[in-house]
């Protein structure tokens, strides 16, 4: 898996000097116990780092400035153990640039009915201390996540971990570099976009290269390197018999191995963690990259076909959120419109990530009726079944919109022996007709990121951090109300953003 930095999250507890040093020391000890136990459970994806209890406006301001300037800090987790007058937090929160989570909890799980006294009440005041803190967050209109519940509850820890992944993806996005080999597919609208605005909004740097730059890298790949990678293919995947029996078919696989090695070296040298290709820009190449792209996606790289840099970058973000699992570049390809059993067949020419596979992928070589090149090698498999979603990031000219549709992936009812590509079938929620009407009204693309792992809540959190519009299509969607929501969002974004 292509790793992110070993980010940390700062745990910051608020209080005030009104209660005396003994009370603040207890707050400090409780905070330390919570952080130690949260880190020890091993369920959180990143380490929580305990910071001092904050009791003055100046200490709060300095802590925020320190968090902003620490490249390893991916966010702040804040909690008011006692009452902490929120005017103290104004100057600090106004300067905060990192993701913020408000953990509304308390150290003790239950009220000690027999022993509770006013000392206990004064110490354990998060029930109203966090409301005071929450008010100033609303007054300042600060983007923040709120999680409520006892800190040892499984659901609280799961939501905390999910948010940490999302925050890390957002922060990592400000260092994301996308390499585009060639340009967009000619005359296609939705894959275009304002790359400067994307860098302003998300931090993404998108750079174009001629395909000749990749071809030169391929020329430098040695036969020994290719042979070793082919051996790895044999260990990980099934190989169609023709690959081992026919030299020209095996040569097609070796060509993809050469592409993979060249692509990876190019990306690593430039610090790129996402990339695009285009079947119309393949001068000097024998095949469209297929197997090579699938393998790199499985390592965590973002990818978009036909120059689609927005989907490539979004895939990289969602790979981080999903910890590299069950997430792929996707395209709505064709429909099964049997009444009462409407389905979408999702696929692409070649480039679907094997992390969504239900079975062991098989390397096969077949003609590709587009691009005008030799028969490319690719991984062939059926997608897994289960709850999933499709997400599409589009550029509306004056802003970005994220469109999300929840789906249910299903096992294919029948084999498709003449379709040798990776593919997945799904049912749209609430139905194919309603979901697709809403999708089209929202301007969602035909390219998406498909994921079994990333949740709608995580995508909402990411969009909120990025300050972009996000709309959801799910079981609760009413198409007429959805159209009104789009109109309200348009008015809000034009007037207030």
UniProtKB/Swiss-Prot annotation:
Keyword RNA-binding: no
GO molecular function term, any single one: L-arabinose isomerase activity
GO terms (BP aspect): L-arabinose catabolic process to xylulose 5-phosphate
The EC number(s) this enzyme carries: 5.3.1.4
UniProt keyword annotation of Manganese present: yes
Keywords: Arabinose catabolism, Carbohydrate metabolism, Isomerase, Manganese, Metal-binding
InterPro entries: Ara_Isoase_C, AraA_central, AraA_N, AraA_N_sf, Fuc/Ara_isomerase_C, Fucose_isomerase_N/cen_sf, Lara_isomerase
Function in brief: Catalyzes the conversion of L-arabinose to L-ribulose.
SUPFAM superfamilies cross-referenced by the UniProt entry: FucI/AraA C-terminal domain-like, FucI/AraA N-terminal and middle domains
Cofactor binding summary note: Binds 1 Mn(2+) ion per subunit.
Cofactor(s) the protein requires to work: Mn(2+)
Binding site for Mn(2+): 306, 331, 348, 447
Any Pfam family: AraA_central
Enzyme class: isomerase
Entry's family note: Belongs to the arabinose isomerase family.
Catalytic activities: beta-L-arabinopyranose = L-ribulose
GO CC entries: cytosol
Signal peptide extent: none
Source species, domain of life: Bacteria
Pathway(s) per entry: Carbohydrate degradation; L-arabinose degradation via L-ribulose; D-xylulose 5-phosphate from L-arabinose (bacterial route): step 1/3
Protein name: L-arabinose isomerase
């Amino acid at each position: 898996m292509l790793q992110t930095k070993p980010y940390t999250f700062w745990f910051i507890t608020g209080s005030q000097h009104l209660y005396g040093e003994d009370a603040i020391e207890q707050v400090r000890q409780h905070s330390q116990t919570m952080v130690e136990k949260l880190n020890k459970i091993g369920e959180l994806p990143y380490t929580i780092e305990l910071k001092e209890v904050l009791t003055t406006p100046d200490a709060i301001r300095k802590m925020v400035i320190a968090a902003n300037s620490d490249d390893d800090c991916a966010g702040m987790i804040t909690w008011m153990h006692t009452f902490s007058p929120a005017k103290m937090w104004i100057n600090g929160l106004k300067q905060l640039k990192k993701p913020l989570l408000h953990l509304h909890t308390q150290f003790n799980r239950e009220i000690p009915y027999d022993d509770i006294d006013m000392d206990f009440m004064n110490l354990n005041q998060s029930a109203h201390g966090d409301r005071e803190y929450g008010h100033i967050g609303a007054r300042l209109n600060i983007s923040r996540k709120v999680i409520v519940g006892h800190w040892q509850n499984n659901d609280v820890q799961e939501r905390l971990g999910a948010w940490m992944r999302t925050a890390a993806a957002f922060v990592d996005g400000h260092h994301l570099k996308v390499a585009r080999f060639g340009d967009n597919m000619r005359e296609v609208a939705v894959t275009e976009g304002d790359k400067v605005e994307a860098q302003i909004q998300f931090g993404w740097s998108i750079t174009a290269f001629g395909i000749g730059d990749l071809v030169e890298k391929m020329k430098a790949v040695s036969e020994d390197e290719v042979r070793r990678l082919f051996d790895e293919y044999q260990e990980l995947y099934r190989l169609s018999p023709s690959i081992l029996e026919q030299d020209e078919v095996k040569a097609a696989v070796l060509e993809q191995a050469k592409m993979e090695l060249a692509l990876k070296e190019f990306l690593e040298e430039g610090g790129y963690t996402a990339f695009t290709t285009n079947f119309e820009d393949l001068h000097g190449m024998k095949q469209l990259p297929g197997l090579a792209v699938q393998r790199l996606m499985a390592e965590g790289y973002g990818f978009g076909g036909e120059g689609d840099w927005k989907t490539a970058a979004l895939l990289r973000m969602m790979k981080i959120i999903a910890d590299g699992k069950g997430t792929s570049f996707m395209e709505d390809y064709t429909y099964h419109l049997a009444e009462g059993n409407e389905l979408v067949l999702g696929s692409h020419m070649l480039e679907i990530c094997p992390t969504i596979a239900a079975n062991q992928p098989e390397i096969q070589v077949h003609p590709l009726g587009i691009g005008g090149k030799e028969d490319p090698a690719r991984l062939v498999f059926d997608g897994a079944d289960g709850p999933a979603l499709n997400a599409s990031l589009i550029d509306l000219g004056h802003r970005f919109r994220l469109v999300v549709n929840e789906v249910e992936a299903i096992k294919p009812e029948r084999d498709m022996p003449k379709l040798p590509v990776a593919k997945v079938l799904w049912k749209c929620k609430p139905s194919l007709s309603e979901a697709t009407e809403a999708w089209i009204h929202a301007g969602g693309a035909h390219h998406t990121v498909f994921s079994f792992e990333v949740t709608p809540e995580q995508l909402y959190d990411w969009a909120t951090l990025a300050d972009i519009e996000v709309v959801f299509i799910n079981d609760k969607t009413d198409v007429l109300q959805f159209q009104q929501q789009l109109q309200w969002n348009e008015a809000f974004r034009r007037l207030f953003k």
